[in-house]
Design a protein with these regions (language model features):
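N-terminal active-site segment of His-dependent metallophosphoesterases
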Residues: 1-66, 70
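A general structural motif
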Residues: 16, 42-45, 72-74, 141, ...
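Active-site neighborhood of phospho(di)ester-bond hydrolases with catalytic His/Asp-centered motifs
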Residues: 22-23, 47-51, 77-81, 146, ...
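Active-site environment of divalent metal-dependent phosphoester hydrolases
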Residues: 26-30, 55-58, 83-87, 152-153, ...
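Active-site neighborhood of divalent metal-dependent phosphoester bond hydrolases
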Residues: 56-141, 166, 170
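Acidic, His/Gly-enriched loop-helix segments that form or flank divalent-metal centers
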Residues: 106, 110-245, 251-256
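Short acidic-glycine loop/turn motifs at beta-strand connectors
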Residues: 140-141, 267-273
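Short, solvent-exposed aromatic-acidic interface loops
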Residues: 279-288
Length: 290
């Protein structure tokens, strides 16, 4: 029974009875209470957090402090694109300070360090040290946990197959996994044809508020957009294939307009089936029948 990190993937050959997954907390303190309720109900479950803990609401510091503690107790904490933007700013690479600041980076710096800290000051912080030690993906025999997605084909875990350029941006394995949207969802992006999942594993992601998901399946079924205050857990799945499970509950939305988008804490069994979901509407959790 081993865990090892290769290509920013934490690979685990064990199958746990249950997994607790939460992504896209975005500084939302209320989400921490949902996690604690899930941990109380499933005390032996493996906690996996899927990225985007910063940039958004007012409790970024409390969220990262909580995750640092949880990791020390065995939680698996993954990176999202917002953490990567923070690291890019700290490492003074690319142009991510502009993109990150557009996505609430200044507010995150003020919450973490009391000011809009310089890259050097950020590199000296415990938060930088913590985030640099986080992998991008966690893979079990039956499940892939990742922030944005992986290519839903047989070579999903082969870094060499990801290299490309899109609208001037270099796409590689790490970039895809934290930023992927349409390329992960669709086989035909123009016509929004929902792709098959050929990885033979359930893929559990955050990154995109589930209310914006839409598309058409090969068999004619439709996935329609939902209202922005209804970011429930959703699946893209064909018969006989494992699901792609989307969990982002919309915590990066305006808290004055959508105050109860507190995220979705999802409990899965070892096969990757959803067992229970905790959110604002169901803080004690709702059981799910597959």
């Amino acid at each position: 029974m081993t865990q090892k990190i290769i290509n920013n993937t934490l690979a685990d050959d064990r199958v746990k009875e249950n997994y607790i997954f939460i992504s896209d907390i975005h500084g939302n303190h209320e989400t921490l209470g949902l996690i604690e309720q899930a941990k109380k109900d499933f005390p032996y479950a493996q906690l996996v957090t899927g990225g985007d803990y910063i940039d958004g609401r007012d409790s970024v510091k409390e969220v990262l402090d909580y995750l640092i503690e949880q990791k020390s107790e065995g939680a698996i904490v993954l990176l999202g694109n917002h953490e990567q933007m923070l690291l890019n700013y700290a490492n003074e690479c690319e142009h991510q300070d502009g993109i990150w600041f557009f996505n609430s980076g200044r507010d995150t710096l003020r919450q973490l360090l009391g000011e809009v800290a310089t890259p050097e000051e950020l590199r000296a912080s415990r938060y930088y040290r913590f985030l640099t030690g986080c992998p991008i993906m966690y893979e079990t025999p039956n499940i892939v946990f990742v922030h944005g997605g992986v290519r839903p084909d047989e070579k999903y875990n082969d870094p060499a197959t990801y290299n490309s350029v899109d609208h001037g941006f270099k796409i590689d394995y790490d970039f895809y996994r934290i930023w992927a949207r349409e390329r992960f969802w669709y086989s035909d992006t123009l016509n929004k044809k929902i792709a098959h999942n050929k990885t033979k594993k359930t893929i559990v992601v955050g990154h995109t508020p589930t209310c914006v998901l839409e598309g058409v399946f090969d068999d004619g079924r439709l996935m329609n957009r939902l209202s922005p205050d209804h970011c429930i857990v959703r699946k893209m799945q064909y018969p006989g294939e494992p699901a792609r499970i989307f969990t982002d509950g919309g915590s990066h939305s305006d808290p004055l307009i959508y105050p109860h988008n507190d995220g979705n804490v999802v409990v899965l069994d070892g096969k990757g089936d959803v067992v229970k979901v905790y959110n604002y509407n169901d803080p004690q959790g709702t059981e799910v029948e597959e």
